[in-house]
Amino acid sequence: MNKQQAELLNGIALAYIGDAIYEVFVREYLLDKGLTKPAMLQKNATKFVSAKAQAKIISAMDEVDFLTEYELTYFKRGRNAHSKTTAKNTDVVTYRISTGFEAVVGILHLTQQKERLQEFWDFSLKTIEADLV
């Protein structure tokens, strides 16, 4: 997929791939930290991938103007997208913010912005790492 095609995707599609990419980042990080027991992996992964965690990261990013205008465009596209799925363990607003978060990861991945995606991950890690067991 080229950049132009990626930029035309709807917010849900971007969040779909962004969710998968972010999940891989988290899983690799946890394994690298030496966590191997399934219960601990799941418990700690949830601290990164839950809608509440992703909303917390976006809030922290907003406080320091971390997101570029380009990224904000795709965050809003994801946040404002109408999804058929419903929030499981959170309110609708938090769920939509997390969809926006995942959409940013998706657009960065699909447009091959690897350095910026790493910066995004590093910021996310710093924001959530203090909550790890």
From Swiss-Prot:
Query: What does the UniProt entry say about where the protein is found?
Result: Cytoplasm
Note whether Transmembrane helix occurs among the keywords: no
Q: Which GO terms describe its cellular component?
A: cytoplasm
Q: Which GO terms describe its molecular function?
A: ribonuclease III activity; rRNA binding
**What are its E.C. numbers?**
3.1.26.-
Q: What class of enzyme is it?
A: hydrolase
Location of the active site: 19
Q: Which UniProt keywords apply?
A: Cytoplasm, Endonuclease, Hydrolase, Magnesium, Nuclease, Ribosome biogenesis, RNA-binding, rRNA processing, rRNA-binding
Q: Which Gene3D superfamilies match?
A: Ribonuclease III domain (1.10.1520.10)
Provide the primary localization. cytoplasm
Q: Which GO terms describe its biological process?
A: rRNA processing
The record's InterPro entries line, in alphabetical order, gives: Mini3_fam, RNase_III_dom, RNase_III_sf
Needed co-factor(s):
Mg(2+)
Top-rank taxon, per record: Bacteria
Family indicated by similarity: Belongs to the MrnC RNase family.
**PANTHER family under this entry?**
MINI-RIBONUCLEASE 3 (PTHR34276:SF1)
Function, as annotated: Involved in correct processing of both the 5' and 3' ends of 23S rRNA precursor. Processes 30S rRNA precursor transcript even in absence of ribonuclease 3 (Rnc); Rnc processes 30S rRNA into smaller rRNA precursors.
Q: Give the quaternary structure.
A: Homodimer.
What is the name attached to this protein's record? Answer: Mini-ribonuclease 3
- Could you tell me which species this protein originates from? Lactococcus lactis subsp. lactis (strain IL1403) (Streptococcus lactis)
